[in-house]
Amino acid sequence: MKFLISEAIYENKISSLHKIQKSTIYMLGAIIGDIAGSVYEFSNTKDYNFEMFPPGSNFTDDTVMTMAVAEWAMKNDINAEADVQTHLLEETMVDMAINVPCPMGGYGGGFHTWLFHPERLIDYRTGKSASARCPYNSCGNGSAMRTSAIGWLYGDMETTLRVAETAATITHNHPEGIKGAQAVSAAIFLARNGASKVDIKEFITAKFHYNLDTPWEYLHKTYGWNSSCQGTVPQAIISFLTSDDFESAIRRAISIGGDSDTLACITGSIAEAYYKSIPEYMVEKAMSLIPVRFKKVLEMMGEKGYCYDKNIL
């Protein structure tokens, strides 16, 4: 199939990339999108020229869990037993949630219970109380919004998709929850390795069967709240595909309405990898809001991942 051919082409490009310098801090696209959309999540705007970062803008649970997955991925041994990998991920996510409370919004009901009240979990497979934290068959967009680091860290598509599945299934083990996480990670992987928008679209369509042909203008007129992967990820990718630069991608994602911070978080993560440039004022805003722990995660990502040539700071 065509996506298999594309996969091979883009994997071959990795050898021409170089490791970024330790001073580089990157992977801010997801964070900036989250912050930009934070005030519009429950007060949607359809105005493309909305105010960027109005008073009250801040990072949300989307950023907290993005950083948790990034921190885990850099410590994780992908060759370890599955339960070892998921146990480390669980520890990292819970630790991050406890020690870095999100200043805006909160966690979705099921995920909040999983994080803070595992004793209340019901194992959906048996209908009985769970003896420990377990996945809850969610197809929510939380699995997709937290996976951007995975698109940056690995040298081949197969590993990228496998790790994205691990990051999703600890909570979101519904097929759509897994697919959403993998699609976002794959799009970032392709974008950072020089794939064109046409190629990214063709790969995602063939591999994940998302409809990416819906005109953005139609979404702008008709789209509303949807917190599922299948109702968020395609729309976020379309916002990227129809954009002209990083900022226009964020504006397109937010101005269709819906789950604005998550849409822009996903769109921003792909747009950064593709455009390899972020406006300085957006970088400054994000860096002024995130805690030291997040900055350290970003610095570590710069040491372990591939990135574009020009430092954004």
Model region roles, listed by residue range:
Residues 1-313:
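Structured, active/binding-site neighborhoods that engage oxygen-rich ligands
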